[in-house]
Amino acid sequence: MITTSYRPSEHTIKTAKQLSKELNMPYCGRNKQTVEHLLKSAERDLLVVGKERFELYTKQGAKFFFHPNTAMFRAKRFLQGEKEPMLRAAGLSEGDTFLDCTLGLGSDAIIASMAVGETGSVVGIEKNHLVSVLVRTGLHSWETGIEELQAAMRRIQVKNGDCFEHIKQLPDNSVDVVYFDPMFHEPVETSDGIAPLRDLAEDSVLHEGCINEAVRVARKSVVLKDHWKSPRFEQFGFNVMKRKTALFHYGVIQTSP
């Protein structure tokens, strides 16, 4: 169900009604009702449209909203010239194309967008329709106070759909880097930012066909970010970049000659 913030403007109400049509979800006027009351009457989750952000409340009690999350800290370090592990794993350069197959909150896509710059491109695929709407809206409207970061966020293209189906439609060698960051098999305690996503995560376990298609379309590399104990690195033939103090590693399949 979709509703508005407590004291909505006419624009907020119009936006909420438009979203209800786009998402095929019922619209309910707020009428000063509490989120808790509305959530009880909602068939599934509750999307609250506000002036500055959208909030999603789940039946399981989780609250999800877009925020640049750790990308803010990573962006500052990137601008200071520090080496970013993900960029090093991917081998990203200015002008490259980056396909993020598991967009989530978009933190990695944001850093990739900063690295590839205006001459490159970043596309993020998110299977959950509601999450894709929230993240797309956030990327295009959030004010960060950091010009380079904000511009990078605005450049990201968000697409809703299944990443395997999307990759299958792409020509050979059509992107530079294909990136996967599936929901961890084991929760990582320091990844609090993704905790609300667990209730919303689509069950799209990586499989061999998906990796094979990624290798086909990637000019430079296919990168997998996963828990350090994950069997998927070995299962799919990734060379692991081990980091002594990190709870997750990056695996790389080089596709360039």
UniProtKB/Swiss-Prot annotation:
Disulfide links within the chain: none
Coiled-coil spans in chain: none
SUPFAM superfamilies, sorted: S-adenosyl-L-methionine-dependent methyltransferases
Superkingdom classification of source: Bacteria
Single Gene Ontology MF annotation: rRNA (guanine-N2-)-methyltransferase activity
Name of the featured protein: Uncharacterized protein YpiP
Originating organism: Bacillus subtilis (strain 168)
